[in-house]
Amino acid sequence: MNLWIYAKSSHRDSLENVRRGSTIANALAEFSPTLCTGDYRAASIAKETMDVKNSMGVDAMGNLPHTMQRLDMLVYDNEDVTPEMHQEMSEFCAKLYSVGKDLPFDIVDESYFKENKSHTKKGVFFSDDDYDKWFLNFCNGSKKHDAPLLNGNYFFLDTTKEYEKSFSEVTDEEEYKAFIKSSEYLLCGCVHTCLESLACGNKPVFFMRKDKLSSNVKLISKYKIPLAYGKNLDALMQDFEKVIANYPQTEKIQAYDFSSLKEEIVAVFKEYEGLVPAMDYSYSYANK
């Protein structure tokens, strides 16, 4: 029996699901879980920059039963799962957990809660993805601002020189955690990254991307994180400065307590100890 974690990902998606999945994998490290992601690059990123020990790319969540064994356990973070697929996976697994239902979305890795000192006044992070180059066009023609931009993992390679025209520097995506920790005021287009900044004791400012819907925006209101607006980068940065000058009191985010989940997992391992899954079990969802 093994523990698996699945996080939706692709080059068109942010890595918010993967960051939550990595947080869960690290918190449950004693069970040697494997983090599966929707694309192979995300699996590599999780291992190289999110401290995940075991990761692998899986084309689709529906293909997991071809890798897992019957009666394994699964935690998944995938908003695209249908009730039918959830039911199929529930029948396949000894225990099935869904992020957003069994676990909250505002799970932040414990490393962000450690004592931290900000070294940079301001920082900007849009997202890991910009497939349609919406943010690049948003920045086009702006003046150069006195703030660094953290590069996205899925940004096109040829965009760095363009961003250097708008920001004081472009920080490599491998420096993600250090950048988030060190930026006292972070202008950010990702909800989960705002929560990580908040956990550090820093002051995130959220801005809504216009190319697609952001996930879990309700958490911005829950933690009273301020928003900045602008029709282009210059207007956005001007509003960012106004927010900094009158930054409001935010709600404190707490580290999630995984103790109950760990107890459940231990109990399931003990319950199924020594059992061998039937070899004739047929899982057909992936082929439907």
Protein language model regions, located:
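N-terminal pre-catalytic "stem/leader" segment of glycosyltransferase-like enzymes
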Residues: 1-54, 282-288
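Active-site donor-nucleotide binding/catalytic segment of nucleotide-sugar enzymes
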Residues: 5-11, 76, 95-157
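Catalytic donor nucleotide-activated moiety binding site of glycosyltransferases and closely related
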Residues: 36-42, 48-49, 144-171
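Short acidic-hydrophobic, aromatic-tinged amphipathic segments that line or gate anion-handling sites
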Residues: 53-60, 168-172, 225-235
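Extended catalytic core of nucleotide-activated donor transferases of GT-like folds
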Residues: 54-93
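Donor nucleotide-activated moiety binding/catalytic core segment of transferases
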Residues: 160-200, 205, 209-213
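Catalytic binding pocket for nucleotide-activated donors in carbohydrate/polymer assembly enzymes
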Residues: 194-253
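C-terminal alpha-helical cap of glycosyltransferases
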Residues: 255-288
